């Protein structure tokens, strides 16, 4: 799929320039690697040092073996940082392509909400409202009200 054949998400007015860069990066990645049933979501995230890390959803033949784009991006970020350095994710944007050939910002699944909030509870995570398909920023920890916290 080429980027030219998919309509980009309009940058929300409430989105910072830094987060808009994540949105663009995620859309460009997914336009390049999208494959129906295999790679349908891309994530771009920023760490406190300003670097952008990306990941793409990897669908396995056994559903349990599938890995979400958010986890892949977080693993890439972890691997790029020196040992002992906090992950320090500040923002996360994930996108998928709608059947109509349009990009859409999506919320992380429940497992990824747990993972993101475990490692970076104060990160901004962009989600889309259920009632209006409107992208909004939320604090990672707010994605899971009354989340139990593990002591690491």
Regions found by a protein language model. Name each.
Residues 51-52:
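Hydrophobic "anchor" residues
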Residues 40-47:
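Short beta-strand scaffold segments in enzyme catalytic cores
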Residues 2-32, 36, 85-152:
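C-terminal binding/interaction regions
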Residues 56-71:
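Compact, glycine-rich, soluble single-domain proteins
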Residues 15, 19-22, 45, 55, ...:
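Hydrophobic alpha-helical segments and helix-packing faces
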Residues 69-94:
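Short, solvent-exposed cationic patches
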């Amino acid at each position: 799929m080429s980027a030219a054949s998919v309509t980009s998400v309009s940058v929300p007015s409430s989105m910072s320039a830094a987060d808009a860069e994540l949105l663009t990066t995620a859309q460009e990645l997914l336009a390049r690697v999208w494959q129906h049933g295999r790679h349908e979501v891309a994530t771009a995230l920023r760490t406190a040092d300003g670097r952008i890390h990306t990941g793409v959803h990897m669908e396995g033949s056994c559903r349990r073996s599938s890995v979400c784009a958010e986890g892949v991006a977080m693993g890439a970020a972890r691997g790029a940082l020196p040992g002992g350095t906090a992950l320090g994710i500040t923002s996360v944007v994930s996108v998928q392509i709608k059947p109509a050939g349009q990009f859409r910002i999506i919320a992380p699944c429940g497992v990824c909400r747990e993972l993101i909030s475990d490692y970076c509870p104060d990160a901004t995570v962009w989600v889309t409202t259920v009632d209006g398909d409107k992208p909004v920023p939320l604090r990672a920890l707010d994605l899971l009200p009354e989340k139990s916290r593990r002591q690491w």
